[in-house]
């Protein structure tokens, strides 16, 4: 499967979620030094090849801030920009999301920070977490594959939902720093893949 086909596949998955991914979700994918990105405003239910463009030569533009950050990251190859319902509540409040579920500790990390929409802040945030919240905007989830970025999107919304609902009865108990680090490192080690295996996402 080529890059555009892979992006379209995950766009359709996002469109089929039982909740909204926000008014303008986007997908960014890096392959062989090139960056591909869905056009702003694309309806993921009806995505076509024309909705996916290469932006490698346009990384200095306002529209490609996240793509420029992805280009700088060494291991991550995919990003999803979305504002799901419970994550949106944290963005509105300007608060980071802490890990209260093992899934989040393993797949995303201990804490999802709030950052400004700048290449440097996004890059720095994603060096230690698989997600960041852009102040007043949306969440960015990333991964070594689109599957990982998509999984992080699902886990982040699930974690935010648990945190919000638990706040009614005094708040969720967050996982400790050491436990989070151990779970995260185990996940990365256990599910690490060679470059050839990662390329299976492209080759099908």
Regions from the language model: what does each represent?
Residues 1-204:
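Glycine-rich flexible loops
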């Amino acid at each position: 499967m080529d890059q555009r086909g892979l992006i379209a596949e995950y766009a359709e998955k996002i469109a089929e979620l039982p909740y909204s991914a926000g008014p303008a979700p986007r997908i960014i994918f890096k392959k062989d030094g090139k960056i591909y990105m869905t056009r702003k405003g694309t309806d993921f239910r009806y995505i076509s090849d024309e909705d996916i463009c290469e932006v490698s030569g346009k990384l200095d533009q306002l529209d490609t801030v996240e793509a420029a950050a992805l280009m700088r990251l060494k291991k991550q190859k995919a990003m999803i920009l979305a504002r799901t319902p419970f994550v949106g509540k944290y963005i509105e409040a300007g608060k980071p999301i802490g890990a209260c579920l093992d899934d989040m500790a393993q797949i995303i990390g201990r804490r999802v920070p709030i950052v400004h929409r700048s290449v440097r802040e996004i890059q720095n945030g994603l060096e230690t977490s698989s997600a960041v919240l852009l102040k007043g905007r949306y969440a960015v989830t990333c991964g070594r594959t689109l599957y990982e970025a998509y999984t992080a999107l699902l886990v982040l919304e699930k974690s935010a939902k648990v945190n919000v609902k638990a706040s009614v009865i005094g708040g969720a108990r967050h996982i400790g720093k050491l436990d989070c680090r151990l779970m995260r490192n185990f996940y990365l080690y256990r599910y690490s893949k060679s470059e050839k295996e990662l390329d299976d996402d492209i080759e099908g």
